[in-house]
A protein has these predicted regions:
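Internal transmembrane alpha-helix with an interfacial aromatic "cap," most often the third helix
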Residues: 25-36, 59-108, 144-150, 208-215
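C-terminal transmembrane-bundle signature of multipass membrane proteins
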Residues: 141-217
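Hydrophobic transmembrane alpha-helical segments in integral membrane proteins
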Residues: 4-24, 124-133
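Membrane-interface helix caps and helix-loop-helix hairpins in membrane proteins
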Residues: 64-70, 119-130, 184-187
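Hydrophobic, aromatic-enriched interface-forming segments
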Residues: 106-145
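Cytosolic, intrinsically disordered low-complexity tails and loops
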Residues: 1-4, 217
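Membrane-interfacial loop-to-transmembrane alpha-helix junctions, especially the N-terminal start
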Residues: 36-49, 98-109, 154-167, 216-217
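Hydrophobic alpha-helical transmembrane segments of multi-pass membrane proteins
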Residues: 17-29, 41-64, 75-85, 161-183, ...
């Protein structure tokens, strides 16, 4: 019982940290939007806000009932909405030339995402996994293409690579988080899931300065 309580406390602390970081991102993004009135910062603020709401529900449920939410779709609505805003941010930041740019490297996204999706579906809800992996494939496809395009640019245009790297890190850690959750269920300091969850928090916050650099292009 004590071990279970300790694991629950660790998960609560990790989720509180994630909620705090995304709330901070929401306020900082909002301040930047109010100062500049740039659509990119509005979309970034929405990304953080939706992610925060999903994390907040999950954390409050843990605190009140000492177990993970049984109806996880409530949190997923917020998290899914955040990825949609992330994609819209991707599209807004990209130029017409970047969107028309073609590279075979982009195929890495479905080549990795589809097998992982099949694997995840054997452990959890099929519809949820199809939706999540589909979105991850889309945003990673565009970021791989954008990164390849940024590598051949000069001047301020090459700063877009920081944003694309940030998105790819976010996607990679999400994949690793889900994979560790399938292979090593539970939440403890020795579980890779715990460390990937903390790493995800760092990736989320890193998107703020990465977007700032991209907006300057």
């Amino acid at each position: 019982q004590g071990s279970k309580r300790g694991k629950m406390q660790m998960e609560v602390v990790s989720n509180l940290l994630q909620a705090a970081v995304t709330l901070l991102g929401f306020f900082l993004g909002g301040i930047r939007y109010l100062k500049s009135r740039k659509q990119e910062y509005f979309l970034l603020t929405c990304f953080y806000g939706c992610f925060f709401l999903g994390s907040l529900y999950w954390t409050l449920y843990l605190l009140l009932f000492s177990e993970t939410p049984q109806v996880f779709y409530v949190s997923e609505f917020g998290w899914i909405a955040s990825v949609i805003f992330l994609y819209l941010l991707q599209y807004t930041l990209s130029s017409a030339e970047e969107r028309d740019f073609s590279t075979r490297k982009s195929l890495i996204a479905p080549l990795i995402g589809i097998p992982l999706c099949v694997f995840y579906c054997t452990f959890g809800d099929v519809l949820s996994n199809l939706l999540w992996c589909g979105m991850m494939i889309v945003v990673s496809y565009h970021s791989i293409r954008g990164l390849a395009y940024a590598q051949i640019q000069t001047g301020t245009a090459c700063k877009m690579r920081y944003f694309h790297i940030g998105v790819l890190c976010y996607v990679a850690v999400e994949y690793a988080l889900w994979l560790s959750g399938c292979l090593w269920p539970g939440y403890s300091i020795s579980n890779p899931y715990c460390w990937f969850d903390l790493l995800l928090t760092g990736c989320l916050f890193a998107l703020l300065p990465a977007t700032g650099k991209a907006v300057q292009t």
